[in-house]
Amino acid sequence: MLWGFDISHLDAHLDALLLRPEFFDVYLELAMEFALPLRLLSAEAEPNVGFPVRKLAADEGVLYADRFATLPAVGTRQAFIDLLHGLEPGVTELTLHPAIDTAELRAITTDWQARVSDHVLLVDDRGLDQVIEKAGITVIGYRTLRDAMRH
């Protein structure tokens, strides 16, 4: 892109650009101009916005995740395995917030225990690759969606 960054997707953190049609128009136009997928809210949450953001994006050929999944507050390995085995076909964005337990983390967020739990699961669990493979999951990122849009 302009400064040489290899941007994989656009993300309006906390769905800020999805709350008003005039903001979403700009978000969607950028996705179309640069052939970038969007991080959109789930189909279940879309009625809260008041206009069909997912359909508008799809009509323009802009890709996005089919659904979202996250672990409960403080997840366990078994909860993660259950979540993986319960995924439906399609593209699911798995949202985790791994963080190392520090005084700063504890000061800035009330969900620090869940973030530390996510970190332990992702970093310390050496068998996670096998669990993912056994569940029949192909791990991709938004770059894969971007490349599909560009070809």
Please give the residue ranges for each predicted region.
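C-terminal domain-boundary segment and adjacent tail
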Residues: 38-41, 109-151
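Histidine/acidic-residue-rich catalytic or RNA/ligand-binding cores of hydrolases
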Residues: 49-55, 76-78, 102-111, 151
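Glycine-rich, flexible loop/turn motifs
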Residues: 64-67, 118
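Short amphipathic alpha-helical surface patches that serve as generic macromolecular interface elements
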Residues: 77-81, 88-91, 125, 129
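Catalytic domains of cell-wall/extracellular-matrix polysaccharide-remodeling enzymes
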Residues: 1-63, 70-78, 85
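Conserved, mostly hydrophobic/aromatic
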Residues: 10, 94, 132
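Aromatic-lined glycan-binding groove of carbohydrate-active enzymes
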Residues: 37, 51-58, 83-104, 138-140
